[in-house]
């Protein structure tokens, strides 16, 4: 998937830091700890301690997407760490809303999990998504992603 970018200027995120890892940030009066990563598109990762399945993503997702910190808007991954090799993720994609899967988002979430010390670089990390599991491996050189392809739709378009 390429090299993970942590430099805020390249994400882009308007914060004067070398990187944004576990950084306190307030959105709509609530403080979150955020980690920002670019996988060729901007991601903001938020680790959740509570019930990720009942998170009101339709409510909080747009607030992150359109926050002034992100001049090009942002994809936001809400992540619960299950163990040091497994995370569960829900994603709010800029311009689309909640989606069942996002490859670059899963990569960003795994990178953030390593940068925050929840997982280890070089280890396979399973990212559990509504649309299925992906396995991510983050190294200093690149981020690898593997997963199953599954047919979900077939149709015909007349032109």
Where are the predicted features?
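Active-site proximal loop and beta-alpha junction motif in alpha/beta enzyme cores
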Residues: 1-100, 111-159
């Amino acid at each position: 998937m390429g090299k993970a970018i942590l430099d805020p200027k390249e994400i882009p995120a308007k914060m004067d830091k070398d990187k944004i890892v576990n950084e306190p940030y307030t959105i709509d009066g609530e403080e979150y700890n955020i980690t920002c990563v670019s996988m060729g598109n901007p991601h903001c990762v938020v680790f959740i301690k509570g019930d990720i399945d009942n998170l009101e993503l339709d409510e909080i997702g747009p607030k992150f997407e359109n926050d002034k910190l992100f001049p090009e808007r942002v994809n936001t991954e809400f992540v619960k760490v299950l163990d040091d090799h497994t995370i569960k993720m829900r994603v709010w994609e800029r311009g689309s809303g909640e989606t069942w899967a996002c490859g670059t988002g899963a990569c960003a979430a795994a990178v953030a999990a390593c940068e925050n010390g929840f997982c280890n670089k070089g280890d396979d990390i399973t990212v559990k998504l509504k649309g299925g599991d992906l396995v991510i491996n983050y190294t200093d050189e690149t981020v690898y992603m593997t997963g199953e392809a599954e047919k979900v739709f077939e149709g015909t378009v007349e032109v």
